[in-house]
Structure formats: structure tokens, C-alpha cells
Regions:
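A contiguous, mid-protein "functional segment" used to position or interact
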Residues: 109-144
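Hydrophobic h-region of N-terminal signal peptides that target proteins for export
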Residues: 9-18
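Low-complexity, intrinsically disordered terminal/linker segments enriched in charged
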Residues: 131-164
Length: 164
């Protein structure tokens, strides 16, 4: 009986994980295009973020609504490439009705390896990003050194930014 329950559980997990491969492929293509838009400094990058969308960057002062983020990023988008994120791994999940999608990804960036998570909603036949948070991945083995660097920086220079 235990083996039967285990087999059923494993089968159910496999079915849930691959419940909608078409949607997962569409989501991956959308997020890949979004990253490509930034890599090629295409203004369409911001069209993929919901008007009420939030972008949280790596600095603790970086929390923007879409239009604030667009204004901040304007100088970056005047170059050939604003920034380039290469996806190393992405996990995609969705609500039962497929209207809300969330994902996490591991990225190779100009800052080194970063992690990000995002929330999207369906908008007709497409999607829009409603929340995205980018974080630098700090190996646990050097975490205390990084913590000291941040503390020393804040004590010396102060943290001039504030939450938005």
C-alpha cells in the first residue's frame, strides 16, 4: 500500500510539474524577449511591465513603479545595450486558472550571478510583469564579509537612499 501511495504521489507531482507545457513555453519566451529587449536597449522592454508594475533592483533604494523605472533607466537605454541578463535556469509556476504566473530565475549578469523572481498576469493573449525583484547571489561562505562591507559603507557614507 505504501508503494502504491508513493507511486501515485510521484505521478501526481510529475503531472502538476508538466501540467501546461505550452503555457510554460509561452512564459519563458515572453521573459526571454523581455531580457533581450534590455540587452538591445529596445523601448519595448517597458511595454512588458504593467503600468502598475513594480521593479526592485539590487540597491535597497531601488523600488520603482514602471514609469519611475523607465525614467531612471533612460540613460541606459540610449546605449546599444542597457544591460544583459543571460538566463541559466528558470522555474515557472501558475495559478489554477492560469491567470497569475510566477517564476524564479538564475541569471548571469554584468554583476555576476544574480537571482530574480517575478509575478506576471495574463493580459488577453499575452502577459505583463507586475512585480520583478533582482538580487545579487552572495555565496554563504562570503556572506559575513559582504555584510561587513555594507555595514562599513553605511557607517562611513551613510545610506542616502530611502524606500520609495
Amino acid at each position: 500500500m505504501k508503494r502504491l501511495l508513493l507511486a501515485c504521489s510521484l505521478l501526481l507531482c510529475a503531472l502538476v510539474a508538466h501540467a501546461d507545457p505550452v503555457l510554460k513555453k509561452q512564459v519563458n519566451a515572453f521573459v526571454d524577449r523581455w531580457h533581450s529587449d534590455a540587452a538591445h536597449a529596445r523601448p519595448a522592454y517597458f511595454d512588458k511591465i504593467a503600468k502598475d508594475g513594480i521593479y526592485i533592483g539590487t540597491d535597497k533604494s531601488e523600488r520603482w513603479r514602471r514609469d519611475e523605472f523607465k525614467a531612471w533607466a533612460k540613460p541606459h537605454f540610449k546605449r546599444k545595450s542597457a544591460w544583459a541578463f543571460k538566463t541559466l535556469r528558470r522555474n515557472v509556476y501558475f495559478s489554477d486558472d492560469r491567470s497569475v504566473i510566477w517564476f524564479d530565475e538564475l541569471l548571469d549578469t554584468q554583476m555576476g550571478i544574480c537571482q530574480a523572481s517575478g509575478v506576471m498576469r495574463r493580459k488577453g493573449d499575452s502577459f505583463e510583469i507586475v512585480h520583478y525583484q533582482l538580487s545579487m547571489a552572495v555565496p554563504n561562505e562570503v556572506g559575513s564579509q559582504v555584510t561587513r562591507l555594507i555595514r562599513d559603507f553605511e557607517e562611513k557614507d551613510g545610506w542616502k537612499g530611502g524606500p520609495r
